[in-house]
Amino acid sequence: MNIRLKPCRFCGEVTAISSKSDAHRLLIVSALSDRPTFIRCNARSADITATVNCLNSLGADIKFVDGGISVKPIKEKRKSAVLDCNESGSTIRFLLPVAASLGTNTEFTGGGRLPERPLSPLREQMEAHGVVFSPINVFPVKINGEMISGEFTIKGNISSQFITGLLFALPLLNGNSIINVIPPVESRPYIDMTLNTLKKFGITVTEKSNSFFIPGGQKYASPGTVESEGDWSNSAFFLTAGAVSGRVTVTGLDVSSVQGDKQILTILKEMGAEITVEQGSITVKKGDLHGINIDARNIPDLVPIISVAAAAANDGETVITGAERLKIKESDRLAAVYESLKALGVDISKTDDGLVINKTGIVGGGAVSGYNDHRMVMALSVLSAVSSGDIILRGAEAVNKSYPNFFEDFSSLGGSYNVINS
């Protein structure tokens, strides 16, 4: 889907959709639990659907129902399964260890850039603990055998998803296990989300220094009903929309959440936006934005929308560092941000691990790609508020990966677009 975005001014209120990251985690632990679970969740994205379908293939019975998701857990382990992860990196990285802990011989398929996204650190540790993989660099990925407990060592600067996958699986094994994480650890808040979810479902994990001790033989105990938090990652786009143009209120976000992307509030405030936090709502109003320095190691998903705020600034230079891992996301996200903003007249340059963006204020119009990347599409849509002309955006359907109703909410806040043929 190609769209024409027109200059606009954002004003209004939206409710945050449920966190995709939280929903992934709740679905997996619910599928491994002792009894059914109802997850209150208002999001039905392509990634969440992929996780639901994969868990059903492993023996769960999960359905989207009014108000959320109904989960009947896996009762009988299946000897074999085919899991279509679509384009979801979270799904394949979380479920590789889970399937191996169940002893299910599994074929993992998928599309988009999923075959290119790294699995080697996780693969090496699983192979060292009894799991047989199909040849390296071959997709689909096939595994055989049941994973055994023991000591696992993972680098912390490639993907926290490897650690999360092991944290889900290791409590199910017969013996005790340890995960040693080699510093530096990036995206640490996502590990904290996993630990919180495990605790809700009765799983004990002890953290000491850079390691996690996981007793074996544990049972997941469902609390019956749980709620997926509001999504700070996707809400960041509309919070930033308020900062660059007008005034936007987002409801349904928890300021005490461990989601790392709530840091968007700190960043926007430091850049000069006016922010009001009240019971149940957050309002961001346009301010006199200026450039700042940002370490993105724990907030890589915010880089596209932070770059939009930086481009809209009236003063100073924004330097983003620690974002090297963006090269292996749904797109080479560093290159995507650079190329698209450059094409729209933004004064931007690349570094080895980030970007340097000089004040631009009003950007130009033009034609850009969405890079089949949901976060790029949403960021460029927000950028239309400070454009001097129309922006033609190709591949806008990529929002379905995480936020299928994005353009409905975009329009409700004053965003202006129409679908075009070319």
Language-model region placement:
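Short, structured segments at the rim of ligand-binding sites
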Residues: 1-422
